[in-house]
Amino acid sequence: ADNRRPIWVMGHMVNSLAQIDEFVNLGANSIETDVSFDRNCQVLVVFDLKTGHRWQFGGITNKVLNEAAYK
């Protein structure tokens, strides 16, 4: 039996779609980001509790995020 586990190369604290592309191009096979959704499942913000920084992701839908996941 093959008991090997995958190695995760994670893009950490990704805060824009451009950064997603950047990390994927650098070899990341997973992305860590914080998102919030409104009642219509629209992405509202990315928020870093440690620094207090807040980024707006206006107009990005679940469809866009799902498409980014399958590039």
Curated annotation (Swiss-Prot):
Relate the protein's function as given in its record. Catalyzes the hydrolysis of sphingomyelin. May also act on other phosphatidyl esters. Dermonecrotic toxins cleave the phosphodiester linkage between the phosphate and headgroup of certain phospholipids (sphingolipid and lysolipid substrates), forming an alcohol (often choline) and a cyclic phosphate. This toxin acts on sphingomyelin (SM). It may also act on ceramide phosphoethanolamine (CPE), lysophosphatidylcholine (LPC) and lysophosphatidylethanolamine (LPE), but not on lysophosphatidylserine (LPS), and lysophosphatidylglycerol (LPG). It acts by transphosphatidylation, releasing exclusively cyclic phosphate products as second products.
For activity, the cofactor(s) needed are:
Mg(2+)
| UniProt protein name | Dermonecrotic toxin LgSicTox-alphaI-Loxn-A
Compartment(s): Secreted
GO CC: one term? Answer: extracellular region
> Which residues does the entry assign to the active site, renumbered to this chain?
H12
As for family, the record states: Belongs to the arthropod phospholipase D family. Class II subfamily.
Write out the tissue specificity statement of the associated record: Expressed by the venom gland.
Q: Which GO terms describe its biological process?
A: killing of cells of another organism; lipid catabolic process
* Protein's UniProt keywords contain Nucleotide-binding: no
Known post-translational modifications?
Answer: Contains 2 disulfide bonds.
